[in-house]
Amino acid sequence: QDLPGNDNSTATLCLGHHAVPNGTLVKTITDDQIEVTNATELVQSSSTGKICNNPHRILDGRDCTLIDALLGDPHCDVFQDETWDLFVERSNAFSNCYPYDVPDYASLRSLVASSGTLEFITEGFTWTGVTQNGGSNACKRGPASGFFSRLNWLTKSGSTYPVLNVTMPNNDNFDKLYIWGVHHPSTNQEQTNLYVQASGGVTVSTRRSQQTIIPNIGSRPWVRGQSGRISIYWTVVKPGDVLVINSNGNLIAPRGYFKMRTGKSSIMRSDAPIDTCISECITPNGSIPNDKPFQNVNKITYGACPKYVKQNTLKLATGMRNVPEKQTRGLFGAIAGFIENGWEGMIDGWYGFRHQNSEGTGQAADLKSTQAAIDQINGKLNRVIEKTNEKFHQIEKEFSEVEGRIQDLEKYVEDTKIDLWSYNADVLVALENQHTIDLTDSEMNKLFEKTRRQLRENAEDMGNGCFKIYHKCDNACIESIRNGTYDHDIYRDEALNNRFQIKGVELKSGYKDWILWISFAISCFLLCVVLLGFIMWACQRGNIRCNICI
């Protein structure tokens, strides 16, 4: 007798999801490595090797440092009144004027860099009884001796150097930055030759601050033919405040002020070339795209940049769990459900159906469940980027040798922040990956349950993601199941009749085996009963005695 399941009276419908031959390994909360059909790299690990000049205004310092440009070193005159978003200092920058030091170099550099301008306003300071515009052979401006263009070196006039007392109010509505200095001669003779007094002094004050500097006379290592030094200082005068300068010698006076601006301009040391291109994020290595949430190119950044992490790679799952398709399927060929494996041949959707009926075999994607999964996954990358991208810049920190402990503490804090963000990135990506896999599995289960509810008693769950349909189901019938218009009442009587026939035949085909097992069990039971009866009878007759000792 032929089985009803082998003729045209039944059909097989399987549900499955797509798969690829070689997936991508990602990390989730529960698994360090799980294969998915598709994933996106989240860590930017390389730069363009060049700094883009758009949309940020880049000012190439070339052979000048920012402080040299600020002071007006002769070879930096081209930077007068310049503006920038990012000032790029080069490793080959050098000073070419009178040797100087800035006791609070890092703070001054940072202050000017963030202001984003070298706009300078000359003011009418009155220096009575002294000679102005001093110069040095160490600071050539053309063939003649020169000096920093933003500073005024005051020396004796004749044989006198009177006490200077000058005030300059700030009647404007913005902060003013004044740069001034103190000259440290190399010998006592140089001191008296320039300033008459054996020891001079400078005091600069406002209502909020006061600085008093006494020259330190003594020989230092020769630089550009000079063993003396100039110490550069700075004072910020707020609106409504007054700048007061008192000196009896050694004063390097300001010629005016720099107009301070508030903004997010910055400075960066880099030897990367500047090119015409567009990039929001800049590192010392060059510009990098900011379409990823993380980067490990450089800790120092400017602009809207990915967050720096230690990891070289973090992959965000943008596809479902990948279960490559098995190559052999026995009698049913490739028709098997999602419980066993995915389907590599399905390219027009993530979820779908395969069927086998009287008209042959076929496959179709389920676009509704596919779109539901894609809608939930789309935007994941953008959401991660929004959570992590810096909207500000991270500048390099500089400290003098005296502030070594502060530098160590700052480094520790920065390293701790990087460790924390690296850990957070790991957890964030693992959580997102877990969510992606769970939701794609959920969509598969939803589709399977939806199909089960349609078929009801007309089909049987085969346990592998497939249904055995107990009625004739042509391609139109299969299509009605896929699109949700299937009416199980129409096929119920036929399905019940075929189910009973198939189950009955299956019972008859296994009848002999059941009889053998039942007969064996009864025989064993009867043998045990006879043996137990014989022992009891023998004990009563005295033929067998049983002693129990305690």
From Swiss-Prot:
GO terms for cellular component: host cell plasma membrane; membrane; viral envelope; virion membrane
Membrane-spanning intervals of the chain: 515-535
Cellular compartments annotated: Virion membrane; Host apical cell membrane
Stretches in topological domain Extracellular: 1-514
Keyword Glycoprotein in record: yes
Chief location bin: virion
InterPro entries reported for this sequence: Capsid_hemagglutn (IPR008980), Hemagglutn_HA1_a/b_dom_sf (IPR013828), Hemagglutn_influenz_A (IPR000149), Hemagglutn_influenz_A/B (IPR001364)
SUPFAM superfamilies referenced in this protein's UniProt entry, alphabetically: Influenza hemagglutinin (stalk) (SSF58064), Viral protein domain (SSF49818)
Record's keyword terms, sorted: Clathrin- and caveolin-independent endocytosis of virus by host, Clathrin-mediated endocytosis of virus by host, Disulfide bond, Fusion of virus membrane with host endosomal membrane, Fusion of virus membrane with host membrane, Glycoprotein, Hemagglutinin, Host cell membrane, Host membrane, Host-virus interaction, Lipoprotein, Membrane, Palmitate, Transmembrane, Transmembrane helix, Viral attachment to host cell, Viral envelope protein, Viral penetration into host cytoplasm, Virion, Virus endocytosis by host, Virus entry into host cell
Pfam families referenced in this protein's UniProt entry, alphabetically: Hemagglutinin (PF00509)
Lineage: superkingdom: Viruses
Residues annotated as glycosylated: 8, 22, 38, 165, 285, 483
Site-annotated residues for Cleavage: 329-330
PTM comment text: Palmitoylated. In natural infection, inactive HA is matured into HA1 and HA2 outside the cell by one or more trypsin-like, arginine-specific endoprotease secreted by the bronchial epithelial cells. One identified protease that may be involved in this process is secreted in lungs by club cells.
Molecular functions per Gene Ontology: host cell surface receptor binding
Residue numbers on the Cytoplasmic membrane side: 536-550
One Gene Ontology biological process: virion attachment to host cell
Keyword Isomerase recorded: no
Annotated disulfide bonds: 14-466, 52-277, 64-76, 97-139, 281-305, 473-477
Family: Belongs to the influenza viruses hemagglutinin family.
Assembly mode: Homotrimer of disulfide-linked HA1-HA2.
Miscellaneous notes: Major glycoprotein, comprises over 80% of the envelope proteins present in virus particle. The extent of infection into host organism is determined by HA. Influenza viruses bud from the apical surface of polarized epithelial cells (e.g. bronchial epithelial cells) into lumen of lungs and are therefore usually pneumotropic. The reason is that HA is cleaved by tryptase clara which is restricted to lungs. However, HAs of H5 and H7 pantropic avian viruses subtypes can be cleaved by furin and subtilisin-type enzymes, allowing the virus to grow in other organs than lungs.
Protein's UniProt name: Hemagglutinin
